[in-house]
Amino acid sequence: MLAMKRVLITGAGSYIGTNIENWLNRFPSKYQVASIGTINNEWKKTDFSSFDVVIDVAGIAHIKITEDLRDLFYSINRDMTIDICQTARESGVKQFIFLSSMNVYGDDCGIVTDKNNENPSSFYGDSKLQADKVIQSMNDDSFAVCSVRPPAIYGKGCKGNYPLLVKYGQKLPV
């Protein structure tokens, strides 16, 4: 019988974090799940050593990307991600899963394959790419690092462009 995995999710209360937590909680014999916030460095109060896996979904998204927010994007999406990953590694966590973004490929990448070049067209995408590169360098035999680069994420209650797309789509004749 497989041992129960102890999972820590950063980004408590976020759309993705909440949905991952709810899904994992459907399997109480397989996963013990906790989530933590990252606002005001709340995550730094957590002892990571009691967890097997950290799923990092914390970050800035769904706000207008403007030059005056550049430093904030890099501080949260790059620097905090690197700090959380480093803390997980130093605490003996076995696996780190980072929710990156398809935006690391730019706006016109088409279908993503292993042949795509990373070419972010915004500092949102660049901040995610820079985090990806640093945390991947921490990957080794005792600490598995995985970056997931999803396109748009949607579902019941989601934010972002999907609700707007649905709204306009309902008005189109079919």
Set out the residue ranges of the language-model regions:
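NAD(P)-dependent short-chain dehydrogenase/reductase
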Residues: A144-S147, P151-V174
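N-terminal Rossmann NAD(P)H-binding glycine-rich loop of SDR-like oxidoreductase domains
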Residues: V7-R26
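Rossmann-fold NAD(P)-dependent oxidoreductase module
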Residues: N19, W23, T87, G106, ...
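SDR active-site strand-loop-helix element
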Residues: T10, V54-A58, F96-M102, V148-P150
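Adenosine-cofactor binding site in Rossmann-like domains, unifying the SAM/SAH pocket
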Residues: Q32-T46
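NAD(P)H-binding glycine-rich loop region in Rossmannoid oxidoreductase-like domains
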Residues: K44-D79, D83, T87-E90, Y105-D107
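Active-site helix of classical SDR
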Residues: S127
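Conserved Rossmann-fold NAD(P)-dependent oxidoreductase catalytic core, especially the SDR/UDP-sugar
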Residues: I82-F123, M138, C146
